[in-house]
Amino acid sequence: MNQSGSNEQGGTGGVSVWCVMHGLRMLVASLASLIYWVVGGLLFVIAGLVCVPFLPGETSRALGQWLLQGAFRTFLLLLRVLGVLRVEYRGLDKLRDSTGGLIVAPNHPALWDAVCVIARIEGLRCILKASLLHNPILVGGATLAGFIPNKPVHKMVQRSIEALRQG
């Protein structure tokens, strides 16, 4: 600070308007994201309760994957509109054009890569941590989309082989 009470960058040491606006935008984005996940999770639970018992396995799985992909695309669009996230896909489109079974193994520190990959590639059968099937927000979409729990391991391997053979 200099003698006039301002710092060397020209500010007064207080909170700038930009910081306040950024904080408000992040608060709105956080609340919107939370609401989106909770409402979406509940809708997927309802969809799972309705579709899984009444639609054949492949039909309900295809519907679940389509709905989940749309939900993730919409979520990423929401975050982009709010100005908190921008996703660039490089090389991922090549995977969409491949034929036959394919293993995609993202290494996600915060589930973002799973959201981005599912939003971009159709018909994925994901292997997920079995405990996530106890999460009321995630269980509906994961079950409806035919995701494969990672435990027990021998069943995970069997289901994964079946999914690869189906393409």
Task: Give short role names for the model-derived ranges.
Residues 2-23, 27, 96, 154-167:
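Non-catalytic C-terminal accessory region of glycerolipid acyltransferases
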Residues 15-88, 140-141:
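A transmembrane-helix-recognition feature enriched in membrane-embedded lipid enzymes
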Residues 81-167:
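Soluble catalytic domains of membrane acyltransferases
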